[in-house]
Curated annotation (Swiss-Prot):
This is Ribosome maturation factor RimM. The PRC barrel domain binds ribosomal protein uS19. The gene is rimM. Keywords: Chaperone, Cytoplasm, Ribosome biogenesis, rRNA processing. Belongs to the RimM family. An accessory protein needed during the final step in the assembly of 30S ribosomal subunit, possibly for assembly of the head region. Essential for efficient processing of 16S rRNA. May be needed both before and after RbfA during the maturation of 16S rRNA. It has affinity for free ribosomal 30S subunits but not for 70S ribosomes. Binds ribosomal protein uS19.
Length: 172
């Protein structure tokens, strides 16, 4: 089976007309959830994906609300709760130089310019102006690393290694 990537987790239904509430786990929700695009639903206890075509998309608070072609009522989408939406690898678009997909960054080892290993990136937060990488060290403590030029000095996705310059107070 072709490699697939998570783009969202379904957390609930919304209203009565077949909308679902999604927490996006993709770098580009506006692109991934465009009307007419295809996503694949993996229900909670299922290994077989269901192909879905997006009929509508809108933002509501911190969620993306989606509707799919052929599904017009809450009774048709309730089963999707706790499901995961994915796309096929072929649906990924080319990025500009020094741009990366989340899945390329998550799992990378972070080291300082002094050679100290800080841990592995386990999650990427998108609070606003810049992304923030969650790095879990051997001590199981999480460190937050901002993805800014002053901190991130080198990204090698082939070797899964990222080098950072530790600014004063960054790891306190």
């Amino acid at each position: 089976m072709e490699k697939m990537y998570n783009v969202g987790k379904i957390v609930n239904t919304h209203g009565l007309i077949g909308e679902i509430r999604v927490i996006a786990t993709t770098d580009f929700p506006e692109e991934r959830f465009q009307v007419g695009n295809t996503v694949y639903l993996f229900e909670k206890n299922s290994k077989k994906p269901e192909k879905l075509i997006i009929r509508s998309h809108r933002k509501h608070k911190n969620f993306d609300l989606l509707m799919f072609e052929g599904l017009t009522g809450i009774h048709q989408v309730e089963r999707m709760k706790e499901g995961v939406l994915k796309i096929k690898e072929a649906q990924l678009t080319d990025l500009e130089e020094n741009e990366f997909y989340f899945h390329e960054i998550i799992g990378c080892t972070v080291v300082t310019t002094d050679g100290e290993e800080l841990g592995e990136i386990t999650e990427i937060l998108t609070p606003g102006a810049n992304d923030v990488w969650v790095v879990k060290g051997a001590d199981k403590k999480e460190k937050l690393i901002p993805y800014i030029a002053d901190v991130v000095k080198d990204i090698n996705t082939n070797d899964k290694k990222i080098t950072i310059e530790v600014m004063e107070g960054l790891l306190d």
